[in-house]
């Protein structure tokens, strides 16, 4: 696929649709994919350029595109014999900042990588995710952040069920030389 599209993967913690507001969340990207019975892989490439700076620079003012460039690989495995699935995600984001007066721009690269696991035996639905971020944020701070989640759901019937879940996102405690606040990027923050 080539063009404006929603990128929705796994539990939507990193890439989600978020289509409840007028703008929605769409990416101008090239998405290449391959799938067979048990495996699926996507390669996503995106590049953003402001109209007013097509020639002579690419400074991004606040409120512009959320990233300069993005490269993402997503892989999903679905088992035959048991109700198990596993996904791996790697995303490299080029975040651009600069000075409008000097037209000096800098691109910082932030990497997010992780896994999402599901197991659905009978009336149970168990899933978990873990993601790690490294690289640099827009402010050129070194990043070392993580997010983890687990969820267990049981369906009594088609109408009633119970869910227990736990989420953890690291925060910036101000200690050390690394920025520790995890950025959920383009995920759906509520459903």
Q: Where are the predicted features?
A:
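Short glycine-rich loop/turn motifs that provide flexible caps or phosphate-binding loops at active sites
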Residues: 2, 170, 186
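Signature for the C-terminal beta-barrel architecture of outer-membrane proteins
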Residues: 17-175
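Well-ordered mid-protein domain cores that form the structural environment of catalytic cofactors
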Residues: 1-26
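Flexible glycine-rich, low-complexity coil/linker segments exposed to the extracellular/periplasmic environment
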Residues: 175-191
